[in-house]
Amino acid sequence: MENKKQVWLDFDDFNETNNRLDWLWMLKNEFPHFKVNLFTIPGNCSVSFLDYIKKIKWIQLCVHGYNHANNEDVSEKALRVLVLSYGYKRVYRAPYWQLSDVMYERLKKLKYRIMLHPDDTRQGIKYNWNIKYSPPSSDTLRGHGHIQDTQGNGLVEAFENIMKLPKDTIFKFI
C-alpha cells in the first residue's frame, strides 16, 4: 500500500437539499477505498438527515461554520455541542476561508483540526489540489472542492478530474 496514491478529499457546503449523494455514491462505486470529508453548516441539516449520513461509514461530517457568515465567531459552547450532540468531527473550515485570530485560538484550545487556505500563514491543514484541475502527480493529495459549482470546483463539474485518480487510490479522512 505504500506506493499507492493517498488522497484527502473534501467538499464544502454539503447539506440536506444540496448534497450530491448520487455523485458521491458513484465515486464510492469506482474507488474501493473511497472516503470523503464533507463540510456542512449544522443548521442546514435535520437530525434525521444527519443520522442517515452518520450511518455511511465512508463519509465524515465536518464543521463549516455555524451559520456560514463571513468571519463568524462561534462560541466554545456551540463548538462543543456540535461534536457531542451531532457527531461532527473536530475539523473546522471557516466560511469564505475567513478565520479570525480569536476563533483560530478557540478552535486550537478545543483541539479542532483547522483547515486553512494555502495562502494563510498560520499552522493548519492546507489543500494542495483544487479539484477543478487535473490531479497533480504527487503521491499525497489534499483535494478541495464544493458540493455545488460555485468556483468551477463543484463535484459534478470536477467529477472527471477525480476519476483520473488511480482506482487503487487510498482515500483518507482528515
What kind of region is each of these model predictions?
Residues H33-Y104, D139, G143-I147:
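Metal-dependent polysaccharide deacetylase catalytic core of the NodB/CE4 family, i.e.
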Residues M103-P136, T169-I174:
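His/Asp/Glu-enriched short active-site or ligand-binding loop at hydrolase and phosphoryl-transfer sites
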Residues M1-M26, F34-K35, I170-I174:
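Boundary/entry segment of secreted carbohydrate-active catalytic domains
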Residues E2, F31-P32, Q148-I174:
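C-terminal domain-boundary segment and adjacent tail
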Residues Y127-N153:
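A conserved mid-domain beta-alpha-beta active-site/ligand-binding segment of alpha/beta enzyme cores
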Residues F14-T17, A69, I147-G152:
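Short acidic, S/G/P-rich loop/turn micro-motifs used as interaction or catalytic elements
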Residues N18-L27, S75-L82, G152-L165:
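Well-ordered, non-membrane alpha-helical segments in soluble/globular domains
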Residues N19-L24, N44-K54, P118-P136:
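Alpha-helical scaffolding within the catalytic cores
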